[in-house]
Amino acid sequence: MHPITYYPVDTQRLVRSNAERIRHKPYAHYFNPDVAVPEEVFAALKAPLEPEQVLGTSSTELNRLLEPGYLEGETGYCGLPDGAGYTSSLVRFPGATPEMFRWWFWWHSFEPERYSLWHPWCHADIWRTDPETETAPNLTDEQRYVGSTHHINEYIGQDPLDIEITFIDPARWGFDADGFAAAGIGAHACGSVLMKGSHMRLATMVHLARITDDGFELRSRYWIADRAEPRHDPVAGIAQLTTVPGFSGERQAYEQLVHDQTEFNHLATFLPDIYQEFGPR
């Protein structure tokens, strides 16, 4: 593992604020600003993927993620001809289980301090409109986040983003969810990412946790500014994010790869332990 050594100035302020805010929380001992990524990731950051390595969003393409083995370009980024972007990311979680992943995806969302554990430098705030879901009886882990919207403030690179992520049943996008178990997929977190305020679609996000001999591996895909699908009326005159002057899908895809690799490799360092301490009894 190699440490991340570039921290934009605003994220330097944020990590200090996060460290102070979390001090009196019972899980404060999991706050660790030392973040690192595997050496092989750096090669993926030096040049974009080739067009033939980009996975599409049709049901046929998405279900290639259920096939045994790996696809070309499991970790990488690129811009697309229409100005959109694409990010793929593979992160391994030794000693962890899909049950831990499902628990984390609802547990972290009810306090910003929990959220900051995941990426101390870039995660600023999170809240939900359904706080009662945290303690509601007789819900599965999936039911505590699928169908819910997480309101998030974070940095992707040096850019602060106010976004909303609505988590969905992956079958809605054409995944053969009935085939997940046979493919070794034990958990998922798929969602639509919208810009807060304008409700312009920022990304389509897929996380699939596939069981391995020593834990699980997380295979992620982001299609950035892939289509116009506002949940509410968009800002007048703007139909899609790629039409915004100065928007670069390629740059956003690159920064998303750095962010994803950093946060999920960091989560892998403490997920088994925090689940053991704060997970279900």
From Swiss-Prot:
Keywords from the named record: Hydrolase, Metal-binding, Zinc
Binding positions (Zn(2+)): H123, E154, H259, E263
Modes of activity regulation: Hydrolysis of both phloretin and MAPG is competitively inhibited by DAPG.
Keyword Metal-binding set for record: yes
Enzyme Commission number(s) from the entry: 3.7.1.4
Reactions mediated catalytically: phloretin + H2O = phloretate + 1,3,5-trihydroxybenzene + H(+)
A single GO molecular function term of this UniProt record: metal ion binding
Known outcome of mutating Q256F: Abolishes activity towards phloretin
Enzyme class: hydrolase
Effect of mutating H123A: 9-fold decrease in activity towards phloretin
Cofactor(s) recorded in Swiss-Prot or TrEMBL: Zn(2+)
Pfam families per record: DAPG_hydrolase
Domain of life, per lineage: Bacteria
Sites where the protein binds substrate: Y115, E154, M205, V206, H207, Y222
Family: Belongs to the DAPG/phloretin hydrolase family.
Subunit structure: Homodimer.
Its biological purpose: Catalyzes the hydrolytic C-C cleavage of phloretin to phloroglucinol and 3-(4-hydroxyphenyl)propionic acid. Can also hydrolyze monoacetylphloroglucinol (MAPG) but not 2,4-diacetylphloroglucinol (DAPG).
Record protein name field: Phloretin hydrolase
Species name: Mycobacteroides abscessus (strain ATCC 19977 / DSM 44196 / CCUG 20993 / CIP 104536 / JCM 13569 / NCTC 13031 / TMC 1543 / L948) (Mycobacterium abscessus)
